[in-house]
Amino acid sequence: MTSTKEIKNKIVSVTNTKKITKAMEMVAVSKMRKTEERMRSGRPYSDIIRKVIDHVTQGNLEYKHSYLEERKTNRIGMIIISTDRGLCGGLNTNLFKQVLFKIQNFAKVNIPCDLILFGLKSLSVFKLCGSNILAKATNLGENPKLEELINSVGIILQEYQCKRIDKIFIAYNKFHNKMSQYPTITQLLPFSKKNDQDASNNNWDYLYEPESKLILDTLFNRYIESQVYQSILENIASEHAARMIAMKTATDNSGNRIKELQLVYNKVRQANITQELNEIVSGASAVSID
């Protein structure tokens, strides 16, 4: 039978673990709120750039930008955004499953995939898979700078412009709320126009100087950069939300485990006391008989 001392040591150990997970939960809540604020403030920027591009391209039907050109798919590129750290439940695992499924589907029709990786977790997984990694960036922190991302994004854009890559996708975890984060894979290039009522509306609030087609190059690059940056913010917010949930679950489980150990401790202690009483009674009986 386990001794009361061993059970006490287990209770102390689980209690210490509970304190750690509770602290990590509170830190994750604080970081999630800050990142969520930055993430939500950045969404309108990406949406408006897309609307401007839709409007400009609609007004210049004779001008065909390379980012709008649909061509036969011989090779694809994928930007994968993961976390640098663990302890966030199945956040990375669920994303990697979808990414690998998509890559395998392209591989079945002999279409290879080149990768741009953000985050240590994606690097460790796809390095083991033997994937062709064009560039990587890790340890971006809580508030990544756009300058840190431009080089990696520029590499895959250069590959696309040189027609060595025909489609570019981006994979990340989209933040819905603190309880829901969804693995998402969207196509970045070629750019697909939206049949947006605002874009087709003649009443438009913008004038373009210089001519609209001269600014499309800049607009497209800014759009791609903003989409990647926004996706990274979405993934960071998802990471903190997932970690908050994981740590809350761990804290609750620790509490339940402490209760179970306390019950076992009481039973063992009671059994020991009962045994000692029986020994005392037996000893007293033996003395009285003598």
Swiss-Prot record:
Membrane-protein topology: Peripheral membrane protein
Protein name: ATP synthase gamma chain
Subunit structure: F-type ATPases have 2 components, CF(1) - the catalytic core - and CF(0) - the membrane proton channel. CF(1) has five subunits: alpha(3), beta(3), gamma(1), delta(1), epsilon(1). CF(0) has three main subunits: a, b and c.
GO cellular component: plasma membrane; proton-transporting ATP synthase complex
Gene3D superfamilies (alphabetical): 3.40.1380.10, ATP synthase, gamma subunit, helix hairpin domain (1.10.287.80)
Similarity comment text for this entry: Belongs to the ATPase gamma chain family.
Transmembrane intervals: none
Keyword field: ATP synthesis, Cell inner membrane, Cell membrane, CF(1), Hydrogen ion transport, Ion transport, Membrane, Transport
GO biological process: proton motive force-driven plasma membrane ATP synthesis
Function: Produces ATP from ADP in the presence of a proton gradient across the membrane. The gamma chain is believed to be important in regulating ATPase activity and the flow of protons through the CF(0) complex.
Protein localization: Cell inner membrane
UniProt organism field: Buchnera aphidicola subsp. Acyrthosiphon pisum (strain APS)
Lineage: superkingdom: Bacteria
Pfam family, one: ATP-synt
Lineage: Bacteria, Pseudomonadati, Pseudomonadota, Gammaproteobacteria, Enterobacterales
Entries under InterPro entries matching the protein: ATP_synth_F1_ATPase_gsu, ATP_synth_F1_gsu, ATP_synth_F1_gsu_CS
GO molecular function: ATP binding; proton-transporting ATP synthase activity, rotational mechanism
PROSITE patterns linked to this entry: ATPASE_GAMMA
